[in-house]
Amino acid sequence: RGAIWRALSRPGFGQANLIADIRERDDGNYRGEMGNPDLDPYEATNFDLSIEYYGDGSFASFGYFKKDIENAIYPLAVANTTVNGLLFDELLTFVNTDDSDVDGFELNIFQELNMLPEPFDGLFVSMNFTTTDGTSSLDVDNGTVTFPFRKLSEDVSNISIGYDKNKFDIRLSSVSRSPYLDYLADDDSETIQEDLDNNNIRYTDDHTQIDFNLKYKINDNLSLKFDINNITDEPEFYYWGTPNRLSQYDEYGTTYSIGIRYNL
């Protein structure tokens, strides 16, 4: 199957809101975030092509996708800029890029293990892998600069092992992704091209998260649910250009939740 379509998305309120969110640092300097009311809407031409196979308790697909994007919106951290007479040490705002290109391949596989003897015939395996290449370009005073498409990992994989039979629905899943660009930076002493050359661009490091989900159906109306997210306590790590230049390190821990669902 194949498809071609156009899409349009307007900037979010926070991206276009001219009112600044101002925070004073301990050293007396100011940092803040302010939208850009001159942003153009995000426009994209999309093309998808895939081949799919449906078997007895199994599914497989392989696809190619391509997106030609205009006016993608990027956060831009600007150093030492003045707004309404107030000097900001760092101001995060938003800009449109000119042209962006994204293309890649996706593989999906799902297999029920119903050939196994009871009670193991409720087991299944699901896998997904996507590899993507994406770039954006921006016209500046001294030419055109090119950089990775924002928040787009080159490789993303997902694997789940589960059991779905009778009253039980159990899943253990792992999601992995490679690093991606978080936002651009603009040091007032350098051009954006020099910032790119000097690795003054913030990235989010690769990440793997393992989750466990269990659902038990008591009857047609009532079910119990138990989830464990981020079992291995994987942190989020952000860096400037290379991993040895730390920008931010967050630990969220492992979360546990239990719930009851009742359908009227």
Each model region followed by its residue ranges:
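Membrane-embedded beta-strands that build the outer-membrane beta-barrel scaffold
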Residues: 1-4, 45-66, 105-113, 123-131, ...
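Outer-membrane beta-barrel signature, preferentially recognizing the C-terminal barrel domain
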Residues: 8-61, 66-69, 86-112, 149-155, ...
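C-terminal beta-signal and adjacent terminal beta-strands/loops
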Residues: 123, 176-191, 215-264
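Outer-membrane beta-barrel translocator domains and adjoining extracellular loop/strand segments
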Residues: 13-19, 25-30, 64, 72-79, ...
